[in-house]
Amino acid sequence: MIRATKLAAVSALVLVAAAAAAQDDGFTKKFPLASCQFISVGGNRYFPLIPGRQLYYSNAACVAAGKCDALNELWITEERETKRITLPIGGTTRTVVTRVVQERETEDGELVEISRNYFANCWPSRDVYYFGEDVDIYKNGKVVGHESAWLAGRHGARPGIVMPEDGFITGSRYYQEVAPDVALDRAEHKRTGFATRVPAGRFDNCLEVEETTVLEPDDIGHKTYCRGVGLVKDDDLELTAIYANPRPDDDNDNDNEDDDD
C-alpha cells in the first residue's frame, strides 16, 4: 500500500535476504484472526469503512511551492461492492466478506494505477485487516502490469492489520501486508494527539504512521490519519475533498458480492 512503490523486478538474492530479514524484524506479523468475527462495514475511528464515501487527494500545494514536478491526484472510493475471500484461519477454512475500496491514481491527468483493495473489520476489537489487492498499472491508457497484487489465502499470503482500533501506542510495529516476495508493507506508530490542516479543513486527534517494506528498505512513507475521517495525508498528497453518499441500508451488508475466484 505504499503509494508509488510497485515491485517490478527483484533479484533472487534480494528476495532471499528480504525473507530472512522479515523473519524477526520487530514487527508483529501473526494476528488473532480466529477470534475475529469479520464484517465489511464500520471500520474504526481512524479507518472508517463507509460504503459510498469517496475521498480526493492532491499534491497541488507541493506543486505550487515548486517542490513537486508533477501533479499527482488520488481518489479513494469505498465501494458498495464486497468481495468474499476464502482462507485458512485457526485450523479451518473460513470465508470472509471484505469491503472493496478502490484507489485511482493519476499523474498530470494521466491514469497510472487503479487498485481494488479488500478490508474487513474484526469484531469486537475493531481492528481493520487488509486481505489483499488487485492492481492494474497503466501507461498511455493501457494496462501494462499488475505488480504488487496479492490475496490472502493464496501463495502463503495472510491478512495484515491496516489500522488498529484506538489502542494506538507510539512505537507499535506490525505488518499491513503479509505476502511473501510480493507485498510486505509494515507500519510503525510515530506520534499521536496532534492537529493538522489540509485543503479539506482542520482535523484534530491525528496520528502519524511510518510505512516501510523489507522488499525495498530505502523506501519510507509517512501517513497521517485523523479520528472520524481516516487518511488525511499520504506523503505530499493532502485530503482535498470528502464526498459522502451512504445509503440507509448500507449497514445491513447486503451489497453485491464478488467471490475470490
Q: What annotation goes with each model-predicted range?
A:
Residues 13-21:
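Hydrophobic h-region of N-terminal signal peptides that target proteins for export
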Residues 252-260:
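Asparagine/serine/threonine-enriched low-complexity, disordered tracts
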Residues 23-253:
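Conserved functional acidic sites
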Residues 1-9:
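Bacterial N-terminal signal peptides that target proteins for export
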